[in-house]
Amino acid sequence: MPYKILLLGASYGSLLASKLLYGGHHIHLVCLPEEAKLINTEGFKVRLPIRGRAEPVLLDSQRLPGSVSAGPAEGVDVKQFDLVGLCMQEPQYRSPGVRELMKAIGESGLPCMSIMNMPPLPYMKRFPGLDYKSLEAAYTDARVWDAFDPNKVTLNSPDPQAIRPPGEPANVLQVTLPTNFKCATFVDEKYNQILRQLETDVANARFDTPEGKIELPVKLKVHESLFVPLAKWAMLLAGNYRCVTTDGMRNTQDAVHADIEQSRS
């Protein structure tokens, strides 16, 4: 059964959309006017590297089974959709228009699946025993998340990496690390059925080449554990996020080993 899926953010969101379109779903991307105009006219294109092939394959949304549209945050009727994907960087959700859309999404009770680097605050509230109020300072504007039910928010590990190639149109994305999205389940099994259908659709996707159909990387893997999408955070907290100091930059190895006991903690 095709779903109607609302994705906030067309940059990283195009990668997720390119995989979901294989299931015949309709994707609506919330993005900037210039991006929306290009996507509505030409679709979007994702260059995806394949192991064993010298050149990446090109996923053209106009040639995929589903359909895609794009537009601004204003005027979106959230009641039309079955699932929301949160694909923007965390500070962008406080932007005018996006903030109001987020409130409407939260109040609608729609299930939300995040591929943000920063775990949404409602997702963190699914972990018992955390001091949620103390976490609010880590967010640009924690009030953006007030309308969301934690049980209806889940998270993907943002493992796949992609860039907008310099000098290319705004509807082109280049995947640089084609790893999998690892998604935690929702509390409600009704919404998990959507996730598992999408997981199957992405797994079954094949790309036509002169040598025949090939399997594509960047899967959607559904996991029962809330902790799976946070697997990279130990590395980030012990290494990457401690590379910038008041005295300047240092490499990840030095960040970890400068105080090994703190890193272990």
Language-model regions, residue ranges each:
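Rossmann-like NAD(P)(H) cofactor-binding subdomain of soluble oxidoreductases
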Residues: Q62-V175, C183-F186
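Active-site-adjacent beta-strand anchor residues
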Residues: L29-V30, C87, T246
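Conserved N-terminal Rossmann-fold NAD(P) cofactor-binding segment
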Residues: C31-F81
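Intrinsic-disorder/low-complexity, polar/charged segments
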Residues: Y12, S95-V98, T245
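Internal alpha-helical scaffold of NAD(P)-dependent oxidoreductase catalytic cores
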Residues: K103-I105, W145-R264
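NAD(P)+-binding Rossmann beta1-loop-alpha1 motif at the extreme N-terminus of oxidoreductases
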Residues: M1-G52, L121
